[in-house]
Amino acid sequence: NYLVTADVARGDGSDFSVALVFDVDTMTQVAEYRGKITPDMFAPQLYSIATEYNNALLIIENNSLGIGVLSRLQELEYNNIYFSIKSTHEYVDQLTAEAVGGVAGFTMSMKTRPLVIAKFEEFVRNKLININSMRLTNEIKTFVWHNGRPQAMRSYNDDLVIASAISCWVRDTALVVNKKQIQHKKAMLDGIKKTTTTMNTQ
């Protein structure tokens, strides 16, 4: 299984639009895109990348530019987009999101940003992430604390760092919780099947 995390830029400034692909089980980086591309062109690019990697979970920060990309991906009918519950930021699948009014994309807020960055620092420090990109490595080296806020040094970029941090956060929170819920449901269903079989044989 794979996840693709994207950070969307306008395509005409100093920031880049980026997409990172990680193996969910090992958190090994397997692919990377970084370029100055307009949001309307980035959406089909992301569709192709996520489809190529086994219909990967596609995580896009739902800022002003990200919302447009998310809308376009929904028009393209990509069916494995990251959704969350607006009030709690809790991950839900697309079907559940439609029922409970979930929000497409990942919300990076004043509340979630420090948690996301801290999770990335934990993954890097404990070697829980395998980075195969010199560009990402260089961004990490210039990602510093400034006025109480972790960010890129002046004239440097942090697009890949932020996308990687979101990947680590989603992998270690939303996907782990979701996996446990699936295992719990499976155990319950297995128990029901076993009980039914026992009753039928008596």
Regions found by a protein language model. Name each.
Residues 1-88, 92-95, 110, 114-118, ...:
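RNase H-like, metal-dependent nuclease domains and their acidic two-metal-ion catalytic environment used
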Residues 95-102:
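Surface-exposed intrinsically disordered loops and tails
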Residues 104-110:
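Amphipathic alpha-helical blocks and their helix-capping loop/short-beta junctions
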